[in-house]
Amino acid sequence: MYKQIEKWENIFSYFYIDGKIYVKTEENCILKELSLTGEVLWESKETEVRYYYVNNDVIIFNLESLEDKYTYDRTFIYDRRRKTLIFRGEIELNISYIFFNKNILNSNTNENIIVFDILKGEILKKIDKPTIGVTLLVTEKYVVKKYDPYIYIYVKSDYSLLRQQNIQDFFPGEEDLSILEIYSYKDTFIIIARVGIVCLSQKDGSLIWKSDYYACTMEIVGHYGYVCTSLSFYRVDLDTGEKYGYGRKYDRLPDFEYNGKNYWPAGHRVVYHKGLLWYRVYSSGESFILAIDPETANYQWIHKVETYEKVMDIKFYDDKMFVTDTDNNLFIYEEE
């Protein structure tokens, strides 16, 4: 299905836009625009780049403060195509990808919220109001944060606290509860809480459904959620909460064979692409990518990644598959 065409080292994070890859180098922490063959097309004059984000229109990044090495308040924005400077200023922005809605950044810290237009380099609104927890989800209407075992739902327009809920109330006595992921589905929030899943009304927080099956991650495709818990894999109907384990004991995925050797399918996440669920596995010191049929949970493709590190992420762009591992390697594959 895919063949490897490139392997790059020391890639801590990357963005893929219009056939180009944007990376931060280990040495001097310079931002670079690279072709798919690794040719340098552009690099930033600024060094010691800390956080960055790239979309179709802009490249935005920040540098360490000249006065406090734990503050990143020197912000730069470049036009991505022309490489001209749009904005340069001393403003501390949280430029994590989760806070972007097209070209509007809702920078969210524990002290304030800054709504910033990254095309114009202008502050649209500043709200000096503390918020609680780590942001897990931003929708058109809400910002959802968590501080175990609570979730905090803020109204996005003014960051007023709409509601806080103790998820432990749905799983009394469960000491392993941890809020891992939150998703927006129709007019509900789907909360992955390790010891189970809860579906709550966005409007009033009422319980729609709950499951008591362990869950670590979920990939939503249509009205189904595909859930992984190490060796187990099952499907949940997000409208009803009905679980389907493909008729397997403990919902366990079957072992697989590669070059005559048997492996456990130990992994934690699937990614949906072109009708298949792509599953990263680390077993017996080796990393694999398995393509799973979502209807049968049977394996359609087994590929060994040429690394002894754990595969961390799988993403698809155009006809390419991009894979990263824990040693900061980036593997680029092309569809066959």
Q: What annotation goes with each model-predicted range?
A:
Residues 1-336:
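Secretory-pathway ectodomains
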